[in-house]
């Protein structure tokens, strides 16, 4: 069973081909350099660049897999969430291929894809407790199968990735700022700057707007007083505050839902502190099937969509 998957929800256009649960190729066309000058992703530019890039990405994926397009059995693509223009390009490419080779097409969820991207090299044992962290999402999910996802907590305002990027921008760091803050934090003192501790209420929801505002106000106040900001210490203080609440909420979820697998997914799953938290909690609560995704599967890629499609088709064929 060969599946060709397309991921185009933001500023990456990616095509992956999977053959019976083995990833044959995962080609990614990244636009980071094109958007850096603007300090963030420009939706119209992202969609136009997808149009320019999809042809060579498709050719490269087929060439690397040593396959002809007619040998593909299923087409899968990201339907949502994401930038509308970018999603439409991926959908059009997927539908065109599907019509051309007369093969079934699957429209899949981007976040569910991220979750199953974590299982590419480590198979899930259900139930799965997944921490989803990205530019647009901060949520905890319980997964019982490729068709059974339960969101038990989500962001009420800003997502953690958005908070990272906005704080980095105010500090004068380049885009994307999250990875830069993470690297700086490794060398800093988390107790150097005083930031408000995020509230741990009785829910599994998250809120990062208060932390974002507090950071921006502190930076502006220090600048007005002409006090030098130690970037490493600021990053460490910010990162500790941003991730500490994740550890608390996850620990509570582990006690309540008793998962057999613990993992993390989404672009911010590349964050060093969050990865440490996942592994630490897995060890503390003896969840033997605890793992973090390979770094190349953290950011947007089509391999995660291919894996989700494979698991959904497998489940359907068993029924």
Swiss-Prot record:
Q: What is its main location?
A: cytoplasm
Name the coenzymes or cofactors required. Fe(2+)
Q: Which InterPro entries match?
A: ATPase_NBD, Gcp-like_dom, KAE1/TsaD, TsaD
Return any one Pfam family short name: TsaD
**Residues annotated for Fe cation binding in this entry:** 110, 114, 300
Biological processes per GO annotation: tRNA threonylcarbamoyladenosine modification
Report the EC code(s) recorded for this entry: 2.3.1.234
Question: Do you know which CDD domains this protein is assigned to?
Answer: ASKHA_NBD_TsaD_bac
Q: What reaction does this catalyse?
A: L-threonylcarbamoyladenylate + adenosine(37) in tRNA = N(6)-L-threonylcarbamoyladenosine(37) in tRNA + AMP + H(+)
Q: Might you report a single GO cellular component term?
A: cytoplasm
Class of enzymatic activity (EC top level)? transferase
Keywords, A to Z, come to:
Acyltransferase, Cytoplasm, Iron, Metal-binding, Transferase, tRNA processing
Give the subcellular location: Cytoplasm
The family annotation for this protein states: Belongs to the KAE1 / TsaD family.
Designated name of the protein = tRNA N6-adenosine threonylcarbamoyltransferase
Q: Which organism is it from?
A: Mycoplasma capricolum subsp. capricolum (strain California kid / ATCC 27343 / NCTC 10154)
